[in-house]
């Protein structure tokens, strides 16, 4: 199992001779990249969403509410890249070579203990084409139970806001947003989600956003392609019941 402490030591040791050291903006990448930048004594750039030149990039600021074009003068660019902001590259015959390297001495500050995989028949949240998500507006576990039934009925992954996670309504690995997972589904359906910028930062690359919330002034409607002013929990239950028939 990869640990950011060990990965950072390995990457820093192999970085000589390279002018770009890039990580995907995943949980592991976000944890390892700053460590590598510190070991190399270089300034870092986080969450790149577009490339303007070898040392000029576009990144989100203010939880993705604004985009900033930044240029670095560092001789080695150390950065994380938001993979959902880029289209996948078609397969090509000349793939980049993969070279094994020797691992440095184990980092005594961190040790891998155990990895417990969450078993689920649903699609992976970060790669799902359809995601249904719930927030505080679903109120309790029964609202999220209806959300799960809806997801299973249409073959979708399940997401949630940080508030819902903090309330104990759903597991942490469902969290979508700046401090959770960045996703780019074809369809994102939000039930009872007001639309804090920390959450909407994680769904900016969704192709179609459908929002259901009883507050007509909820910020989620500003980013939604389709909106319904209604109780998120009741709407979710009604859709789940309709699918069950």
Regions found by a protein language model. Name each.
Residues 1-245:
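N-terminal glycine-rich FAD/FM-binding segment characteristic of electron-transfer flavoproteins
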């Amino acid at each position: 199992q990869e640990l950011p402490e060990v990965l950072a030591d390995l990457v820093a040791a192999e970085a000589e001779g390279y002018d770009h050291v890039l990580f995907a903006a995943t949980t592991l990448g976000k944890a390892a990249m700053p460590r590598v930048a510190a070991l190399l004594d270089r300034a870092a750039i986080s969450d790149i969403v577009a490339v303007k030149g070898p040392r000029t990039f576009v990144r989100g600021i203010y939880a993705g509410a604004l985009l900033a074009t930044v240029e670095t003068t560092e001789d080695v660019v150390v950065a994380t890249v938001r993979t959902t902001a880029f289209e996948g590259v078609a397969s090509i015959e000349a793939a980049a070579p993969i070279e094994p390297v020797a691992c440095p001495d184990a980092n005594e500050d961190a040790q891998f203990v155990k990895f417990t995989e969450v078993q689920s028949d649903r699609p992976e949240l970060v790669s799902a084409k359809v995601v249904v998500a719930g927030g505080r507006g679903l109120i309790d576990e029964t609202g999220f139970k209806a959300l799960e039934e809806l997801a299973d009925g249409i073959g979708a992954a399940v997401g949630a806001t940080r508030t819902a996670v903090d309330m104990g309504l759903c597991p942490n690995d469902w969290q979508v947003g700046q401090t959770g997972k960045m996703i780019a589904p074809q369809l994102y359906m939000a039930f009872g989600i007001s639309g804090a910028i920390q959450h909407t930062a994680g769904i900016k690359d969704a192709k179609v956003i459908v929002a259901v919330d009883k507050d007509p002034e909820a910020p989620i409607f500003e980013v939604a392609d389709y909106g319904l002013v209604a109780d998120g929990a009741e709407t979710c239950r009604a859709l789940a019941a309709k699918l069950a028939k």
